[in-house]
A protein has these predicted regions:
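Short, acidic, small-residue-rich periplasmic hinge/interaction motif at the N-terminus
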Residues: 23-62, 99
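Outer-membrane beta-barrel signature, preferentially recognizing the C-terminal barrel domain
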Residues: 135, 272-290, 334, 408, ...
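Gram-negative outer-membrane beta-barrel transporters
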Residues: 167, 356, 391, 485-496, ...
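Short acidic/polar hinge/loop motifs at secondary-structure boundaries
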Residues: 110-137
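Extracytoplasmic beta-strand/coil segments of soluble accessory domains associated
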Residues: 70-109
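Flexible loop and strand-edge segments within Gram-negative outer membrane beta-barrel domains
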Residues: 212-297, 303-337, 662
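Outer-membrane beta-barrel translocator/receptor signature
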Residues: 115, 128-130, 141-153, 158-218, ...
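C-terminal beta-signal and adjacent terminal beta-strands/loops
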Residues: 438, 593-604, 628-686
Length: 686
């Protein structure tokens, strides 16, 4: 495997003898000035932003052949995904921090999750995405809770031309070696979108069907390693844009069914099946009005409705009948809803000073058999930031957020300061400090699940987690010349986290688990990213090295077998894209090496003493090769190989003792090498 890494590095070096680097993930010279909106007063280029932002544009998404957002992010530096194949869910990690510290936005509106696992990231229709903007580091002044590690803002497509456009897509993919045309085995996706814009009005609607038929299992298609997952997604949008007024309403809907078919009990020919059924609706009404060149108003209203049902049935193979089971927790319905109101005013006092005051109100409610007392939490916040430009080279942006929460003790004031200094036309320095916080999830506050095998309750006295974050970056970019561009980004960060919420026994003599503000943690690391593009060729190379430190609340009760403070893990990624203009074909190779991930776990030594051990998850390599060919004006074909190294599971030499869903010593990564082919149709009429 080391030879593979060296070969990739040498190959990129041939294309780019100067080994140059970049901060965004697009494969085009013109995209060095990509326009972004996340955390900005108004849309502006990456180069002008005070934040360090990564952008994954629609071309990169198309080139990947991905059927969900996780597949797009999986080869990005700092992103790792953990799969819980017991219940069919996936969570994200960003720069060493878990998904509960990452804010997921859809067009700037927070997406709701039932707990601290970011399942919502896999419940967005990838065919509607224009680009993904990633801001690393706390964004709590602008976006409130959960944005300790950063923000992932998914920007959907918008109609820009007066025309009628119809797009359709069918993609067939194997799951490892398993495949059957259109159903039964493999991965199948169908999509259709219709866009219409006339004068000031725009209308968009579309739908997608995703069908993963699982992977592995016995001869009867049961007891699968990867659970079957079927998704139906739909969306509609109507917009009006005239002069200073821009307003739109959008609705997104999802129905998802994850099926767990357990092995047959041959003594009575009966099997137990479970289905996890999710229904999600997300409404957003957004508008902006420009009073003058110096004064703009933007307002967002959002409402999300989320339901998740557990349905357990007893299937009798002799009678071919199904009946609902009656065991504790085997039939469950949990409901969550959220309301968001956000308004901001952008005012330019002068060429050197701009202000952005704002109001942010968030309300969350939950109910269900495992949620006690039908809780409601409301968060009220006002915030203000200002951009100060003493000259054309310096931009300083301090900000404050003031919070009042109806349930828990939130930090009363959240400060941040970001700065950008243009050291030259090609060299930019960014420095930042931010205080971040994460509010307790409803599940952590009010969860209640007691049966013969579980005794878990929430803790309504939890406090908000908080963090102090310091980060900086140095970005150098050449001026594009002769269709050639070079850029380099060197970034570093240091974060401390306090009052981290964790799952533990309520007392040493009890068998009841609950949540406490118990842990402290730190992350320290750096990234080096590179880009080279010339005519039809583009290449990227990146490296990260991130250290993690975690102090357990009961650490004094354990013997430490290693005095290391930080546990380190490396990553390396690379990509090459070449466009054969005459054949109207683009070839793409994406690669990522994920190094060993050490972690602190509890156990016992040879003397039966409780000890803190360092466990390691094995390193692994992922690579995809894809091609995109434009057959004619209307039809394009995409094809390729994913997971070239055929990675399915990696080893973990220890498992934490308080894992709720313990799948053993293997960590699921993927369902092996897979092949795909997709047919894309597009028709436009002015």
């Amino acid at each position: 495997m080391k030879k593979i890494i060296k070969s990739l590095i040498i190959l990129i070096a041939v294309f780019n003898a100067n080994s140059v680097f970049a901060q965004q993930d697009s494969l085009s010279v013109k995209n060095l000035d990509e326009v972004i909106v996340t955390g900005q007063y108004k849309p502006q280029t990456l180069k002008k932003s005070v934040y360090q932002v990564r952008v994954i544009n629609k071309d990169r998404i198309k080139q990947s052949g991905a059927t969900n957002v996780q597949q797009v992010l999986n080869n990005q530096l700092g992103f790792r995904f953990s799969n819980d194949n017991t219940i069919g869910t996936t969570d994200v990690q960003l720069m060493g921090m878990s998904g509960r510290n990452v804010k997921i936005l859809l067009d700037g509106v927070p997406m709701i999750d039932r707990g601290d696992t970011r399942e919502s990231l896999g419940q967005v229709d990838i065919n509607t995405i224009e680009r993904i903007e990633i801001v690393e580091g706390p964004m709590s002044v602008s976006y409130g809770s959960d944005a300790l590690a950063g923000v992932i803002n998914i920007i959907t497509k918008k109609s820009t031309k007066d025309e009628l456009s119809v797009t359709a897509k069918v993609q067939e993919e194997t799951a490892g070696k398993e495949y059957h045309l259109f159903n039964y085995k493999g991965v199948h996706q169908q999509n259709i979108n219709i866009n219409y814009k006339k004068n000031n009005w725009g209308f968009t609607t579309g739908g997608t069907h995703n069908d993963l038929n699982g992977f592995g299992g016995d001869a009867y298609g049961r007891d699968k390693d990867w659970l079957p997952k079927e998704q139906w997604m739909g969306n509609a949008k109507i917009s009006y844009d005239k002069g200073p007024l821009n307003v739109y309403y959008r609705i997104d809907g999802l129905n998802e069914t994850i099926t767990s078919r357990n092995p047959i009990n041959y003594s009575n020919n009966i099997a137990i099946d479970q289905r996890y059924i999710t229904d999600r609706f997300m409404h957003q009404l957004q508008g902006s009005y420009t009073f003058s060149k110096k004064l703009q108003l933007a307002t967002t209203l959002g409402y999300a409705d989320y339901k998740r049902r557990t349905k357990t049935t007893r299937h009798d193979f002799e009678k071919n009948t199904d009946e609902l089971t009656t065991g504790d927790g085997e039939q469950d319905l949990s409901k969550f809803n959220s309301f968001v109101f956000r308004t901001t005013l952008q005012y330019q006092l002068s060429n050197k000073i701009s202000l952005q005051p704002g109001i942010d109100i968030n309300r969350e409610a939950a109910s269900g058999q495992r949620i006690s007392n039908n809780p409601v939490i409301t968060d009220y916040a006002v915030f203000i930031s200002t951009e100060i430009k003493p000259n054309s080279k310096i931009n300083i942006r301090p900000g404050l957020r003031f919070i009042k929460n109806s349930v828990y003790d939130a930090p009363p004031v959240i400060p941040s300061i970001n700065s950008k200094i243009a050291l030259s036309k090609q060299l930019d320095l960014r420095l930042a400090y931010a205080y971040g916080f994460r509010s307790p999830a409803l599940r952590e506050l009010y969860f209640y699940f007691v049966d013969a095998n579980h005794n878990i309750v929430g803790n309504p006295n939890l406090k908000a987690e908080n963090s102090n974050s310091f980060n900086g970056s140095l970005n150098w970019t050449t001026l594009p010349k002769n269709n050639m561009a070079y850029s380099i980004s060197l970034a570093g960060f240091y974060n401390t986290f306090n009052n981290q919420i964790d799952f533990a026994l309520s007392s040493p003599t009890s068998n009841q688990y609950t949540y406490f503000n118990v842990n402290k943690a730190k992350t320290l690391g750096g990234t080096l990213e590179n880009r080279f593009s010339r005519k039809d060729l583009a290449a990227t190379l990146g490296f990260s090295y991130i250290g993690f430190y975690r102090k357990l609340y009961d650490e004094k009760d354990y013997v430490k077998e290693d005095d290391k403070e930080f546990l380190w893990s490396p990553e390396l990624n690379a990509s090459i894209s070449y466009n054969l203009s005459k054949l109207k074909t683009k070839f793409n190779l994406f690669y990522k090496f994920t190094g060993k991930r050490p972690q602190l776990v509890t156990g016992k030594n040879a003397s039966n003493q409780p000890v803190l051990l360092i466990a390691e998850t094995d390193a692994y390599h992922l690579a995809d090769f894809t091609s995109n060919t434009q057959i004619n004006k209307y039809i394009a074909v995409s094809a390729g190989v994913k997971n070239i190294f055929d990675v399915t599971n990696i080893s973990n030499n220890a498992v934490a003792s308080n894992s709720i869903h313990n799948a053993g010593y293997n960590v699921a990564i993927g369902y092996g090498r897979s092949y795909f082919i997709g047919l894309n149709f597009q028709w436009n009429k002015k």
